[in-house]
Amino acid sequence: MFEKDKWMSIGEIVAPQGLRGDLRIKPSSDFPERFTKPGKRWIQKTDELPTEIKLTKGKLIPGKSIYVLSIEGVSTRSSAEEIIGWKLVIPIDSRPMLSKDEYHYHDLIGLEARSGPSKALIGYVTDLIKGGNDLLEIELVEGKKVLVPFVKEIVPEIEIKEKWLLINPPPGLLEL
């Protein structure tokens, strides 16, 4: 049986590259070696078991946040097109250890967002948007989505094991 919480997406196959079966990958990982170091990986179609593959080479396209990967057995453009939309996944227990105040994307999604001295529930983390300053997408309990800067001053406390984080928003941030 497939256990969804034992796997973590590190990227998505978004397009073929050229005629020889190379693949464009949009990463959702901050660890470039996952896309450049040859070896065993897994790809997964939505709601199916991951399939083991062998990454033969990979490189970052200069000036873009896209990797081009070569996978053993995918040697034509049409075979590459068949797996567009599939995820590149890894076993969740193979994640690298992080320093204090560093978090895996997968661990943040679904956390309760709390606010104020009473730490009242205000919503849930639904996404992390990477950029110059990362943003947490929070779906508020009333259904509206807001973007919150993911900085210590606004998100001073994160309790991964207890599945919540504290937000101290500046006035008006949650009303936007």
UniProtKB/Swiss-Prot annotation:
It comes from the Bacteria. GO terms for cellular component: cytoplasm; ribosome. It comes from Prochlorococcus marinus (strain NATL1A). An accessory protein needed during the final step in the assembly of 30S ribosomal subunit, possibly for assembly of the head region. Essential for efficient processing of 16S rRNA. May be needed both before and after RbfA during the maturation of 16S rRNA. It has affinity for free ribosomal 30S subunits but not for 70S ribosomes. The gene is rimM. Keywords: Chaperone, Cytoplasm, Ribosome biogenesis, rRNA processing. The PRC barrel domain binds ribosomal protein uS19. InterPro entries: PRC_barrel-like_sf (IPR011033), PRC_RimM (IPR056792), RimM (IPR011961), RimM_N (IPR002676), RimM_N_sf (IPR036976), Transl_B-barrel_sf (IPR009000). This is Ribosome maturation factor RimM. Belongs to the RimM family. Binds ribosomal protein uS19. GO terms for molecular function: ribosome binding.
